[in-house]
């Protein structure tokens, strides 16, 4: 969130108005205004691009990648993840039931154990 952008990008209210389906292209075209680490602006670009890296590296969407590594181990049977044009939206949009969210929260509180 501190990598130099002037304003939030890929935010929920903005996404329906993008004319370009390639959100990686949109994200990489955003100019940097500040030096990285010097200015905080909440945005979805960094987490979105991190999700893209996982998807490209392993050749599958985020749910397919994380199910055997995380979700099934936590007993989360059918997670749903919001999609963007062309891929999963790694910056947000993970839909879990309340009990699944509880399991995830306990996993986090127990530092991955």
What are these regions (language model features)?
Residues 86-99:
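Carbohydrate-binding/catalytic loop surfaces
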């Amino acid at each position: 969130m501190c990598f130099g952008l002037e304003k939030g990008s890929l935010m929920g209210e903005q996404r329906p108005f993008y004319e370009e389906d390639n959100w990686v292209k949109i994200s990489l075209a955003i100019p940097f205004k500040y030096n990285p680490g010097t200015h905080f602006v909440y945005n979805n670009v960094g987490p979105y691009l991190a999700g893209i890296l996982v998807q490209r590296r392993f050749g599958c969407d985020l749910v397919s990648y994380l199910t055997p590594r995380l979700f099934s181990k936590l007993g989360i049977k059918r997670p749903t993840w919001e999609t963007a044009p062309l891929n999963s939206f790694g910056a947000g949009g993970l839909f879990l039931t309340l009990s699944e969210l509880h399991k995830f929260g306990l996993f986090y509180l127990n530092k991955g154990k």
